[in-house]
Amino acid sequence: MSLRFVISGTDTGIGKTVFAAALTHALEAHYWKPVQSGLEEETDSQTVARLAGASHARILPEAYRLKTPASPHLSARLDNVSIDPARLLPPRPDGPLVIEGAGGLLVPLTDRLLFADIFALWQIPLILCARTALGTINHTLLSLEALRHRAIPVQGVVFIGDEDRENERVITDIGAVRRLGRLPRLPELTPEALHQAFAQHFNLADFLEVPA
């Protein structure tokens, strides 16, 4: 079976789309964003295509494209759309697949369904993106508890931001989770700079073996 990963985060706006682009490039993977909320600016799929240098064929169409940049349950309500979980089954392309959620794990898709509930059904190894800054210990450990409560397989944690060895140590030790690497903030976010940063700060072998 081809490699498949879910990319989620401890919060919104932490850089998980940028990391998803880096991983998509490194694995020469397909990319899928199940639900896109907000269409006026560059979408996550467009960002990944640009930063990963991925062809149109490797960027799989979203199941839902919602106009309002908000939590999917609200965006869908404003668009008069009903999100059907049956439409959120992961595609099976020929080759690796990177799937990106929205916001954090407990972001609602509907009034009764969270992203974490869908991830639990999928049973695809999840990579948790976390900040390095103040507050990340609590946010990340809570996210890991939510994952384990639902028996979602965890590939590891990716830190994003300036180096903070103590925060990273505490999270990996107390959270009993693998540190996959840290993506630093890039002065200029170009495809070349991103690919170089991934090569310098991550070991691709960590993404070629998945939890049993």
UniProtKB/Swiss-Prot annotation:
The active site is at residue 33. Its cofactor is Mg(2+). Gene3D superfamilies: P-loop containing nucleotide triphosphate hydrolases (3.40.50.300). Disulfide bonds: none annotated. Pfam families: AAA_26. Pathway: Cofactor biosynthesis; biotin biosynthesis; biotin from 7,8-diaminononanoate: step 1/2. PANTHER family: ATP-DEPENDENT DETHIOBIOTIN SYNTHETASE BIOD 2, DETHIOBIOTIN SYNTHETASE. This is ATP-dependent dethiobiotin synthetase BioD.
